[in-house]
From Swiss-Prot:
Organism: Mus musculus
Gene name as annotated: Erg
Phosphoserine PTM positions: 55, 88, 103
Subunit text: Identified in a IGF2BP1-dependent mRNP granule complex containing untranslated mRNAs. Interacts with SETDB1.
Pfam families, per database record: Ets, SAM_PNT
Protein name (record): Transcriptional regulator ERG
Family: Belongs to the ETS family.
InterPro entries assigned: Ets_dom, ETS_fam, Pointed_dom, SAM/pointed_sf, WH-like_DNA-bd_sf, WH_DNA-bd_sf
Biased composition (Polar residues): 41-54, 271-284
Superkingdom of this protein's organism: Eukaryota
First-listed, main subcellular location of the protein, grouped into a coarse class: nucleus
PNT domain boundaries: 120-206
């Protein structure tokens, strides 16, 4: 059994008792007399200055008057006693009287990676914690474990008409052999379905190797704790709803699996602690924050090559957006302009300095940020950049729009090219004389020394049709042959 007890000075002290390997019991402060093997050492203080044995049973009037407690229960199982692949524990957080959300993680998850996923407990946490080692395999439960599981199920699922005394002679092996009809003989049908479904879930679902809370870090060098961690166990945290307001209830969630598992809910009994068994108050700073431990991507390494390539105009004058990319490609310019993440957003930390450098590049000494910002608005319609709303001096490049803007366009002269000059129109004009097309360049008119016009065609061969002077009939003209018949 592993217990952690704080002193009023808020220092964590170890209160560990040796539990033999064959004794896997779900112990409570009000447990049965055979559990009185454990002992606890309280920290020295004005109120708690002695080492005392825990009472095997606390009178009812004592624990009813105690403040609500937050109980941590750790289930431990020997790998040789676990069936199938159930060689690792599970951790869930449940609010009494509330709902608990959880799902298993992959088997073999390390403690460090799990601590990164845990939610930071409320800083004003004043609850007590207690860790108890119990078997993770339901077949290893004792009758006391079965009783505590039933008590937890009644509170967690709001079950009615469940008589725990009817299960007092049933241990884990007998419980796992019970059928639905056996459950219905002891409790109503609705309760039987809930209990049987959750029992099957505990038996069939592989449990990841996880631990529960910050006390592990304080006790991580303890050989007994390391033994309990290496042998496998399940840690369950149960904060009391009367301590936390509903808005700040602590719920631990896991990534969803490819299949939809049944309702994820760890179980345990609720313990009422004596004043001597107050647990350590975990410090919020003891839990590492996921945001601080995630590797931060360097935007200059990711966007640097792209910025350098786009900032080079090749031939011609550099544009303003290219000048900004040129500044952003070098991290030494972060005193005046810097990337804000890796999505193309940037911020001018010193806009006047950026405007001054742009004025030097363009030989405009009167350049200021007002003029520069007006020039940047021109790029909004071009889909080159946009203004980040709600942030001063913050803009965002649209690299997709820049890629479209840099695509080469055909020259405008080709749009007015004569069709005969286009390559695909060559065969169409190969034989214009067959299509009765007029040649675009008519031949020059023939000019003779005797006449402006060429020799007459047959239309002007009639003797009476000599309209123009100096016309003569061709020498090959034949006389009429009609005279031979008359």
């Amino acid at each position: 059994m592993i217990q952690t007890v704080p002193d009023p000075a808020a220092h964590i002290k170890e209160a560990l008792s040796v539990v033999s390997e064959d004794q896997s019991l779900f112990e409570c402060a009000y447990g049965t007399p055979h559990l009185a093997k454990t002992e606890m050492t309280a920290s020295s203080s004005s109120d708690y200055g002695q080492t005392s044995k825990m009472s095997p049973r606390v009178p009812q009037q004592d624990w009813l008057s105690q403040a609500p407690a937050r109980v941590t229960i750790k289930m431990e199982c020997n790998p040789s006693q676990v069936n199938g692949s159930r060689n690792s524990p599970d951790e869930c957080s449940v609010n009494k009287g509330g709902k608990m959300v959880g799902s298993p993680d992959t088997v073999g998850m390390s403690y460090g990676s799990y601590m990164e996923e845990k939610h930071v407990p409320p800083p004003n946490m004043t609850t007590n914690e207690r860790r108890v080692i119990v078997p993770a395999d339901p077949t290893l439960w004792s009758t006391d474990h079965v009783r505590q599981w039933l008590e937890w199920a009644v509170k967690e699922y709001g079950l009615l008409d469940v008589d725990v005394l009817l299960f007092q002679n049933i241990d884990g092996k007998e419980l796992c052999k019970m059928t639905k009809d056996d459950f219905q003989r002891l409790t109503p049908s609705y309760n039987a379905d809930i209990l049987l479904s959750h029992l099957h879930y505990l038996r069939e679902t592989p449990l990841p190797h996880l631990t529960s809370d910050d006390v592990d870090k304080a006790l991580q060098n303890s050989p007994r704790l390391m033994h309990a961690r290496n042998t496998g166990g399940a840690a369950f945290i149960f904060p009391n709803t009367s301590v936390y307001p509903e808005a700040t209830q602590r719920i631990t969630t896991r990534p969803d699996l490819p299949y939809e598992p049944p309702r994820r809910s760890a179980w345990t009994g609720h313990s009422h602690l004596t004043p001597q068994s107050k647990a350590a108050q975990p410090s919020p700073s003891a839990v590492p924050k996921t945001e601080d431990q995630r590797p931060q991507l360097d935007p200059y390494q990711i966007l640097g090559p792209t910025s350098s390539r786009l900032a080079n105009p090749g031939s011609g004058q550099i544009q303003l957006w290219q000048f900004l990319l040129e500044l952003l490609s070098d991290s030494s310019n972060s005193n005046c302009i810097t990337w804000e993440g890796t999505n193309g957003e940037f911020k001018m930390t010193d806009p006047d300095e950026v405007a001054r450098r742009w004025g030097e590049r363009k030989s405009k000494p009167n350049m200021n940020y007002d003029k520069l910002s007006r020039a940047l608005r021109y790029y909004y319609d071009k889909n080159i950049m946009t203004k980040v709303h709600g942030k001063r001096y913050a803009y965002k490049f649209d690299f997709h729009g820049i890629a479209q803007a840099l695509q080469p366009h055909p020259p405008e002269s080709s749009l007015y090219k004569y069709p005969s000059d286009l390559p695909y129109m060559g065969s169409y004009h190969a034989h214009p004389q067959k299509m009765n097309f007029v040649s675009p360049h008519p031949p020059a008119l023939p000019v003779t020394s005797s006449s402006f016009f060429a020799s007459p065609n047959p239309y002007w061969n009639s003797p009476t049709g000599g309209i123009y002077p100096n016309t003569r009939l061709p020498a090959s003209h034949m006389p009429s042959h009609l005279g031979t018949y008359y």
